[in-house]
Amino acid sequence: LIEEETGKWYNLNENPIEIKINWNETTNTTVENELKKSQIKIIKVDKENHEVKLKDVELEVLDKDGNVLEKLKTDKNGECYTKRYAIRDYPELYIRETKTNEKYVLDTEMKKITLKENEIVNYTFENQKIYGQIKVIKTSEEDNKINGDKKGTPIPNVSFGVYDENKNFIEKITTGADGIAITSKLEKGTKYIKELEGESGEWYQLNENEYSAEIVKHGEIVELNITNKPDNPNIDVEKDGIIQTTANQEIKYDFTIGNIGNVPLNNFTWYDYLPTEYVTATKLVTGTYNQDIDYAIYYKTNKNDYRLLRDNL
């Protein structure tokens, strides 16, 4: 017995069936036909790089009425298989993602997949990795006495290093005229921002603090408001000596000069006003300095312009 044609939803039974017929007897033979079936192979990948497979993504398989037929989870290769479904009963199925990798955006779109007779239907799902940016707003912490910037003024040309959660360098960003610097697209997670030495902006102090920012949602821009203290050059001069004297007596004054500002001083000038009708300067002593650098000392009186007293001290 050879089957030549069968029902629409069934596979033809191509196996010849041997039937033994006995005289004056009716022989009954059962011939089975399998329903035409199909299943789906799901592959979860990174949207930008299909070589990256996503494991432990959870999905549901539903019928056209929204009934959940089974639940799936991708393996280490980002793959999972549905059961085999009869085409007669389920000509199409729907796939819904319920949980994805924490670094990726959940795909909420319901996928409609048409089954094919006696085939495994391959379906690739893409997931968008979560990206965000960090926006640094750099302003003056106080009024700047050197350049006249008021408190809150944007500071240009300040550079920052951007680092990942393991403190690995990612990129360098620099503020524009508006005091704003913004990173490129960064993956979800905690990032660190630190001002780069020597690039804190003209007339401003380096901010040595490390700042953190966490990117949680796709497309978000996390703002960091960071301030810098202005450079504040300043010196303190103490004058010690006798208060009263008699005519023609030599008097001596000692000056203690200290840097009380927040920047090194390349040069500075101090003044001492004496009554010229009563006093004549006779000697200037260079003094003692506590930094091992070269010094040049100039002096000026009411009788002459600046003159070099000592060089290369």
Say what each PLM segment does:
Residues 1-313:
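Solvent-exposed loop/turn and edge beta-strand elements of beta-rich ligand-binding domains
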